[in-house]
């Protein structure tokens, strides 16, 4: 069915309530209606019969004003238009006296029930429902929180029983406090926040006190009395213990804090771009040597670079520290000296050996100096050539 004028075609509106108390209502209207006329129509056909002044209509996240026409607001390509109906509350909040009297009635009834020793669940539920009534159907979600509900929230807090216990059973020597006022300078949510802050500060203070007591107990510990020895017969001196020779520490050890196998990050991060960069550097170096020298020199330089690289990789260890000894051998040599330290003949023999070593050291000074010059020259040459070759990733030592 097609309509000749657009204004005469009915439009279908789906009215949704935010509090979900009523099902979605489908209403037919016309595009030439204003929002005010639609509100008056809803006050007649909607189940809760809300007044036009209390209605708020929201379409596509926008509040519809009363003077707007539906043809200027609704999208023409949609078949159904979803409109949200929000009703403002006209009920004034309850007075503080009523809430205070209801609280006193609740405390007196709870005192009577505790003194009798038997509680009725059915009556408790009825009292709760009568003390905290449900919101009326015409109210929306944002206006359903009454002062009584916030008061119930405060009394349901875990720390609220401390105040009730202090009010019912005061400490000896003190009078029972007066009834707590129903309304204070702070809101119920602020009171809850202050209670949580106080509990946390009290916990921190108790922890600090306990740690200080444990520290003072450790400092005030009595020293262990020493056994009394006879001055006439002193005990013999015990033999000195051999020095603890610590094993040699490898400075290249890699640690893994995660507890898994040791993995070198440089080996993992060497992608194809890194390899291309390394190969390009080597190619530039070799091209310079090849174009600016003869073929024989190029072969000699290539061979030298390969040998230096293999030596750096650890395939040809040319220089070995022959003077290094195992720590166990030094410990084995130290122990006989400690054992024979009190022998006078052994002391004389060691003095004679020391004189002979002085003469031998004077004769070997020149040899050591000559070896130092050769070692320095070899170190300079190897360092120069190895600096021309790009270094590879360090080998992980487990």
From Swiss-Prot:
Name one process (GO BP) from the record. Answer: endoplasmic reticulum unfolded protein response
Query: What is one GO cellular-component annotation here?
Result: membrane
Q: How does it sit in the membrane?
A: Single-pass membrane protein
The family database entries (InterPro entries) matched by this protein are listed as: HERPUD1/2, Ubiquitin-like_dom, Ubiquitin-like_domsf
Q: Which PROSITE patterns match?
A: UBIQUITIN_2
Q: Where is the composition biased (Pro residues)?
A: 233-245
Q: Where are the transmembrane segments?
A: 298-318
Q: Which CDD domains does this UniProt record tie to the protein?
A: Ubl_HERP2
Q: Which controlled-vocabulary keywords does the entry list?
A: Membrane, Transmembrane, Transmembrane helix, Unfolded protein response
In what ranges is there compositional bias, type Low complexity?
Answer: 96-125
Superkingdom assignment: Eukaryota
Q: Where is this region: Disordered?
A: 90-143, 212-247
Q: Where in the cell is it found?
A: Membrane
Domain Ubiquitin-like intervals: 11-90
| Protein name, entry field | Homocysteine-responsive endoplasmic reticulum-resident ubiquitin-like domain member 2 protein
